[in-house]
Amino acid sequence: MSVEGLLSEVKHFNAHHLDAALGEQLFYGGKRVFSDVKPGTSSGGDHGCKGGKSELKGAIHNAKHAADKALNKEGGEDVSKLREEHSALAKKVDDLASLVAELQLQLSTLRQGQTSSVAAPAAAPAAAKEEAAGDDDFDLFGSEDEEEDEEKKKVVEERLAAYAAKKATKAGPIAKSSVILDVKPWDDETDLGEMEKLVRSIEMDGLVWGGAKLIPIGYGIKKLQIITVIEDLKVSVDDLIEKITGDFEDHVQSVDIVAFNKI
């Protein structure tokens, strides 16, 4: 065999070896799988070439076996991890479902309590309405009573309207008072008849004299008790007494008010 043929065989073997190493680098990220693959030397022509090919095939087979083993191992771990996570998640879901069911039960209980508390006060008005309806059923003369009440109300309103109209057209009432006066003389020698004439001689707007009589005091002395009616806005009792005692001081000692009544 020539030197050129031997170099061609070596170059061909090295090319296969480089392709396998590059595939290993790309797939395993730098991990060495073909650690047992050693470049062979062809010392005997065809024998060296066949030995190198056999070793290359064995290395490729070992690489595939190692790759399948690694993939199966990593996939099993991932599946186990996923199963554990799935179990944990399922447990959490069950716990949440139990919590939601408990909350729904509590909410339903609260709603039932509120419904009963609201229905209790409403029962009283309903009972009152039913009672009133029952009374209406047994009140045979209820409609007549209502008509009578309406008629009475109309009569009262008419009378009030008439009174208001009459009061508007008529002047207001005059405030008057009835006054009883005791007119006392100086002594028993005073002419009581003349004293009465002097008292009655007083004339004022709103003053009307009434009846009079003589009442004994003692020691033969008598006093004159006389009634008068005055209009409160026109006549003052104090002014009247002052006028009697001032104008007739020769006959009159004093004047006292016995009674004072509004008319």
From Swiss-Prot:
SMART domains: EF-1_beta_acid, EF1_GNE
Disulfide bonds listed in the record: none
Keywords: Acetylation, Elongation factor, Protein biosynthesis
Keyword Protein biosynthesis: yes
Coiled coil: none
Chain intervals with Acidic residues compositional bias: 133-150
GO biological process terms on file: translational elongation
Residues annotated with N-acetylserine modification: S2
Region of interest (Disordered), ranges: 112-153
Gene Ontology molecular function, alphabetical: guanyl-nucleotide exchange factor activity; translation elongation factor activity
GO CC, alphabetical: cytosol; eukaryotic translation elongation factor 1 complex
Keyword Protein biosynthesis included in the entry's annotation: yes
Family statement drawn from the similarity comment of this UniProt entry: Belongs to the EF-1-beta/EF-1-delta family.
Matching PANTHER family: EF-HAND AND COILED-COIL DOMAIN-CONTAINING FAMILY MEMBER, ELONGATION FACTOR 1-BETA_1-DELTA 2-RELATED
Subunit structure: EF-1 is composed of 4 subunits: alpha, beta, delta, and gamma.
General function of this protein: EF-1-beta and EF-1-delta stimulate the exchange of GDP bound to EF-1-alpha to GTP.
Protein's recorded name: Probable elongation factor 1-beta/1-delta 2
Species this chain originates from: Caenorhabditis elegans
